[in-house]
Amino acid sequence: MSGHSKWATTKHKKAIIDSRRAKSFAKLIKNIEVAAKIGGADMSGNPTLVDAVQKAKKTSVPNDNIDRAVKRGAGLLGEVVDYQTIMYEGYAANGVAMLVECLTDNKNRAAAEVRTAMSRNGGTMADPGSVAYNFHRKGVIAVPHADAPTEDDVLAAVLDAGAEDVTDHGEVFEIRCEPSDMVGVRQALQEAGIDYDSADVEFVPQVKVEVDLETARKVNKLVDAMEDLDDVQNIYVNSDVPADVQAALDDDDEE
């Protein structure tokens, strides 16, 4: 590969990374605005806002942007924040179930963009309820290995607070609980001196479908297309990617 074309490729990749970083910031800001609108700007009485702000800070969103988002959401700047949460259902390659969660101020735009992304990237839309039943809402808290000596330490800290399960995912321990127990589990971690990276309510698949490399690539292509949409906040799939397939996907990303 010539130096010129390599530079062009590098520049193109950097543009993609910068674009996705900007979109990530915008989505984090939306979460802060909505949390502040629902629960107010006072962090001490709004744990959802605390989580949204913490997540934004960990992703290096500037403090000025965070402060403005809190004030804007709480109505302190005279602006009206009016977002709707809408869930779209569909299937990726080989019947992999997909939920697409949107936070939008224009329902028609969101619907049109999700449908277009689905049809152009090998997915199909599904009727309401036909996919969602495969998932259930759970509180999901990620604790980095660096902040917790062992899985047993994490389990001991959160078991009495309502945690249902602790799983070791290599770099992080994942704690699952009922959404209503999230505050208690977070407090239990803090009391034990254990820091956490993120705490979110997610749609967790009840049954996962193991995928091969070709299917995983197709699913990732569709997920990437969805993540590029401004109105899309979260995407959930029920694919189970084996270690060897994930290694091959990681190699794809490095090329």
From Swiss-Prot:
The keyword Cell division does not apply. It comes from the Bacteria. One of its GO terms (biological process) is regulation of DNA-templated transcription. SUPFAM superfamilies: YebC-like (SSF75625). One of its GO terms (cellular component) is cytosol. Transmembrane segments: none annotated. The keyword Iron-sulfur does not apply. It is found in: Cytoplasm. This is Probable transcriptional regulatory protein CMS0715.
